[in-house]
Amino acid sequence: MELLQNVAYVIIWSMNAAIDASSLIVLAKLNAIQEAVDAYGVLGITQSVEQETVYAGKTRGYADAHRIEMAIISGQIIVNEINNTIVKKAAELRRSSTALSESDCHIIAFSATKALPLVLQDRRARLAAEAIGVETISIVGLPLTIYIQATASYERSIVVLSQISKALSLESAIQKTLRSALDEIKRLRKDNGG
């Protein structure tokens, strides 16, 4: 029993970021959970995010739900129980930001309590998270991050950029700016022998 507690303790402290349900679903649909883990480290979710992404998704027959479940089983994503502190903070968020779902409030409160950056796409949720001091990360920057960190090739980064742009209906100007940044990094690496 003590060994299991020690393993759980190590796992909890190895999380590098948390992720909300909608961002996780987008990444699962794009088959890009591995890229997110490469960029941000092991991802933490709450039980309510698991409920929304895995159990509800499997009930509806969504393939992305199975991808998320496999990422949980493999340890890329860790499901965390929420304690009373998180429940109270989530309730406060829900009262002040009525547009947020319970799942959003839980993951924001979890991130705040654990001092983890939060991968989060929804604008309202980002504003609520940032208002309580949570660092937020947009998945729009994922293609740049994985290329800068050299965890993905230029070609894979371009594919991820294209997929994210389509999934999030990014304006072409934003997509072109990100593509230009990838091109410039590639050029600089070539100039520096890398």
Can you describe what each PLM-predicted range is?
Residues 139-153:
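Long, charge-dense
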Residues 87, 126, 144:
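Positions that flank functional sites
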Residues 123-124, 141:
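Short, ordered loop/turn segments at secondary-structure junctions
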Residues 2-110, 114-116, 123, 134, ...:
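Active-site-proximal, substrate-binding regions of enzyme catalytic domains
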Residues 163-166:
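Helix-rich interaction surfaces within compact, conserved domain-sized segments
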Residues 127, 131-137:
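A short alpha->loop->secondary-structure connector
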Residues 55, 130, 148-149:
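Short Asp/Glu-rich motifs
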Residues 168-170:
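Long, amphipathic alpha-helical surface segments
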